[in-house]
Structure formats: structure tokens, C-alpha cells
Amino acid sequence: MKKADREFIFNKYGGRCAYCGCELVKGWHVDEIKPVRRKQVYDKIKGKWVYDGTCRHPQRFCLDNQNPACASCNINKHAMSLEKFRQLVSGFMVSLNRDSTQYKVAKRYGLIKEDIRPVRFYFETFKGEGT
């Protein structure tokens, strides 16, 4: 990727993650909004599936389909559609309440206030500079 293209993507939302809105730091990722999905082939010698260097949707590898993302959001989103990623994030509170003792204790002590509302990504609310 060209340095100018990476800079363009970084500035798309004022240097913030398109999904959670955190400030992007060194190591930020370029996310394909609609997944490109790398192809895999079965390697008989290694006995496992490996990426073959090609992708299923090469036409999606373009600036219009790319968002700046923090590593955490991009790793969690992986190859999901936006709506699947939204569903995943929506379920985090349920899994924290079910699986995390520390979360449940912190909630009982009033350290955490849950806010149940639809997940809206930062890019959906971004108004741009000067607006």
C-alpha cells in the first residue's frame, strides 16, 4: 500500500478508529469494510489449511472499501460484515456478565454502569472537521 493511501485512510475519521472511535496509535490497521477473504488451500505436507496468496474478492481491495481501525476492532471484526460485527459487539455485555467474575464484582461495587443501547460505529456518527 502506498504511503499516501495509508495516510488518506488514517485521516478519514480524524485519526480515529472507524468502529470504536479511539485515537489510532502506531500499529493501527487498515480494515476492508466488505471482507476481501483470503483463499486457503489444504497443504498435505503440513496437514493443515494455509493461505495461498490470493483472495476471493480482489475488487474489494480499494480505498472506498477501507477504513482505519484500531488493532482490537480489526482483529475482532476479522472477515465479518458490518452487521455481524455489530451483533458480536452487542453480545459482549452478555458474555461479560456470564463469564467474567471481575466484571460482575466491579458492577456490584458500582464501578461499571451498563448502558444497553444499539451499537453505533464511530463512522456512522462522524461529522468531519468543521461541522
Where are the regions that the model predicts?
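Short cysteine-rich clusters marking metal-coordination/redox-active sites
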Residues: 17-20, 70
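Short regulatory "switch" loops immediately downstream of catalytic or recognition motifs
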Residues: 33-44
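Extended charged
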Residues: 1-4, 12, 21-25, 42-67, ...
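Histidine-centered catalytic micro-motifs used for acid/base chemistry in nuclease
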Residues: 29-35, 68
